[in-house]
Swiss-Prot record:
InterPro entries: C1q_dom, Collagen/C1q_domain, Tumour_necrosis_fac-like_dom. This is Protein HP-25 homolog 2. It comes from the Eukaryota. Residues 43-76 form the Collagen-like domain. Residues 82-215 form the C1q domain.
């Protein structure tokens, strides 16, 4: 039956052809290189992140070089230095003391450069207000002495001593605040009959410690 034989042959040929295509397809898959995407591909840049926290301060830098010398300054004003005021005296006498309740007149000046002590009246007059020191020294023999240091008719200090058959020494000093025109002197407080027995030597002194300056 030639019709069936030709049909069978055609089917065999088709199967062989399909088999051949399958083998070729398998071989092609085995030898083909898989296609992959490139690893070098990059997307678009992202948005900037927020600022970071400040870092700690760095160590101090080395000293810089010396600067240039500045210009010479303007000369200052020259003021004269005033010397402090002076007032001092020292007087003595070798005579008996005068009658009481009056200034003792000292006839010899050991120092009286400013003439603030009056040798005629025996009175010191303040011409520089300030703080003064006044004092006296008496050497006596067979005498009774009583002295008062006066300021403007007010007794500030009183001293007395008696020497029968020997020598005695009597001294006193005081610090006074004086204003312009104040007067200071030394006077006897005993009657002259009590002081005219033996020799006597008297010294009276005073000097400015410091003046009263404004401000």
């Amino acid at each position: 039956m030639p019709g069936r034989g030709g049909q069978s042959l055609s089917m065999v040929c088709v199967d062989v052809w399909i088999l051949a295509l399958s083998v070729l397809s398998v071989m092609a898959d085995a030898t083909s290189v898989p296609v992959t995407e490139s690893c070098d591909s990059q997307g678009p840049p992202g948005l900037p992140g927020p600022p970071g926290l400040p870092g700690p301060p760095g160590p101090p830098g080395p000293p810089g070089p010396p600067g240039l010398r500045g210009p010479t300054g303007i000369p200052g004003d020259i003021e004269s230095c005033l010397s402090p005021p002076k007032s001092a005296f020292a007087v003595k006498m070798n005579d008996p003391l005068p009658a009481p309740s009056q200034p003792i007149v000292f006839k010899e000046a050991l120092h009286n450069d400013q003439d603030h002590f009056n040798l005629t009246t025996g009175v010191f007059t303040c011409t520089i207000p300030g703080v003064y020191r006044f004092g006296f020294d008496i050497e006596l023999f067979q005498h009774a002495v009583k002295l008062g240091l006066m300021k403007n008719d007010t007794q500030i200090l009183e001293k007395e001593s008696k020497a029968k058959d020997n020598y005695r020494h009597l001294s006193g000093n005081v610090v006074l605040q004086l204003t312009l025109g104040d007067r200071v002197w030394l006077e006897s407080k005993l009657d002259t009959t009590e002081t005219e027995k033996g020799p006597i030597q008297s010294m009276f002194f005073g000097y400015l410690l410091y003046g009263n300056y404004p401000g």
